[in-house]
Amino acid sequence: MRAALCRLRFQTASNRNILMNKHINDLLFHPFTPLKGSIKKLKKRTHAAVLKNGEVVCGRIRHWSSLSNCDFVFDREGNILIADYHIRNRKSAAERNLFRYDGKNRLLESWRIMRSCQFERNLYFYSEAGLLWEMQVYEGIIAENSTDYAGWLHFLPDGLLADKEGKAADIERLNLKHRHTVYYEYDGIGRLIRETEASESVEGVKTYSYDGESGRIKEYCFYENGIRIEQWLYIYTPQGWLQECVYRHKDYALPSTEYYEYDDEGNETAFLCNGELCRSTRYENGRPVEEIIYDSHDGGKPKNRTLWPAANERHCYTWHEKSWLLESIDYTNAGGNTLKSQFFQSDGTPNGTSECTYTAQEMLESVCSINASGEVTSRMQWHYGYDARGNLVRYYCSENGRLDSYDIKTLEIEYFDAEESV
């Protein structure tokens, strides 16, 4: 197979994270829907595509921070055959996700390889009509300590799992064990209506029932030895909003009920559990302006309140179980993000403050302790500096005026190395 490198980059700067995650999810993690991986579709989501002889046979989508890459192998019609999604930490792979397709945009095999040498393998099987009817899940861990193992496993174009030298990988080293199997059932026109998960490590079976027309879940059950242990029933409004959840357990005499209320635009205005109000939200022009969380175990007293006076401003209040104000938080992000917190004693006097200011290049956090007389007893301040790619490059700590600084290269912390990948 020819290998022409195609680098695909997102054009929108403000939503690069969201677009990347959504794009990867659309392409890789939904086995029920045929893959939307044609070249035309990919080009619409990208800034540029490099073609060879008018065809793309390999491709790469690169995360803006260069910490995540997704490499693709296509056939001549633009269908994805192999996908390799890897997240980098420093200069090695922190997690690897490998995907193999059948050339008809159906997922056949997937691997999740973690830096801790833990492995997850899924196998997918389809009916003659092309519907997914079984998924087998395996888990394992490599026998010896080999932290770079996740970095060089990959699929060859013919679908074989290979090592860094291109030879067939020794799967037996992974000690894979079959954990559970998921079976899928459909109605007469191919709509998913039931999902059954049978586990080999746990004596139990999980079943999920769906509405074939809307795809919404209707019921979840857990069985042990043929006896139903748990059941969740879901009821929706005519508009499709979740209205009620009923939970039953074989050891409980009465069911537990959750109920949701909405305004005309579908915004959730109230959440009740067993008839008691747990959360209420007030909206103005489709935007939340107030949310109150109540303590259902203490007569329905408010324990948290959040106000949004403006789109870039938020105020949070937390009450103690004895109804005195415990903490207040003020958040603004106009011209830089700022988070201010105040802590109070039972008589209403403050006993501490915390302020955090952060931008794309730095974060500054200050904490003060206050005694009963209102005097500041201690001050601590932390300063973190970042480069343009988000790497931590400076770190200072000040306690009561005494400054400590650290060389980031010798400081024993985890940070991302955003070096350009090749």
Where do the language-model regions lie?
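Positively charged N-terminal leader segments that act as targeting/secretion signals
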Residues: 1-14
